[in-house]
From Swiss-Prot:
Protein name: SH3 domain-binding protein 5-like
Composition skew (Basic and acidic residues), residue ranges: 344-358
Biased composition (Polar residues): 34-45
Coiled coil start-end: 55-98, 170-272
Organism this protein belongs to: Xenopus tropicalis
Region feature Disordered, mapped onto this chain: 1-53, 276-305, 344-373
Task of the protein: Functions as a guanine nucleotide exchange factor (GEF) for rab11a.
GO molecular function annotation: guanyl-nucleotide exchange factor activity
Amino acid sequence: MEGKEGPSCEVRLPTPGAEREGPIHPELGAFGETASNTIKLSESSNDGKKEEIEEELDPRIQEELERLNQASEEINLLELQLDEARTAYRRILTESARRLNGLATQLGACIDKARPYYEARRLAKEAQQDTHSAALRYERAVSMHAAAREMVFVAEQGVTADKNRLDPTWQEMLNHATCKVNEAEEERLRSEFEHQRVTRQCHEAEAKVQTLQKSLKRFIIKSRPYFELKSQLNTILEEHKSRVTSLENSVAQAKLRYSGTLRNLEQISEEIHARRTQSSLLSQRAPPLGAEAPPSVKDGETGPPADTVSLLSLQTIASDLQKSDSVEHLRDLTDVTSLDGRETGAVECGGSRERGGDRGTGGAFRHHRSVSL
């Protein structure tokens, strides 16, 4: 008895797990989301740290800024003091001129008649100072001449110590000492002549003072208050003038320090700019040899992080493994697969079951699966 022919066994069975959308294992999906969030947080923290490091000032900048502030404060203070000193000098000069003019009006012509005497006294005082300086130079020249002669004597003793042999070292020393003696002798003669000259001038100036003092004694006594006041005022003016000159030099030095600090700051700024430029160039590294950038990444853009790519590959492999495990119960599956996921042949499931001698015909079925590389 023949059995009824059943329907065709060519039935496409759905791949287990294909009906579900989303990740096959929820744990892997959650792990992927957590890892992605962790990567983003780490990237954001790294960017924040990098910006914080870049924003951190170079300690040299703080030092130079402190020096700049100190120099600026010093310049302001010195300029104020300089203005005050100049104002005081002008005030004293005006007051001195007013007082001297008033006193000259009271004394009359005796001031002009006694002026040669005070001028001779001034020249005599300068001659005395020149004489003192010339005397010091002459004494120093005499000492140098005596030391040079002593050196010549020592060198001569060394040369004549060994009569059988002439030592070139002692000979050179003797020549050098002889030159020093000649130079010292010339300096001594020149200093002696200068000292005699200024001494003679000093004597002449003192003699002239004595002569004028005798001839202009009455006018000298009458005009003495004027010239004494003038001498006092000149001393005060010289002190203020020296203070003004000193403050001007201090201001100039402070401005030099200020400009030097500005140059240092400019140099530090250039170094920081060059270092940041070099860091930005080093951060844009090329991919390793053999690695291919994803097609979606354009030139000048950065692709996804390496950890994200590894996580996506892990999810794909896990999905394929689950698909392979879910069809282990299927029998007689073909082992020939293609890269695009299509089977090269159909599987016939004509396994017949014989019950009580009857011959049953089973239907063939196919199963499609894909292999991910």
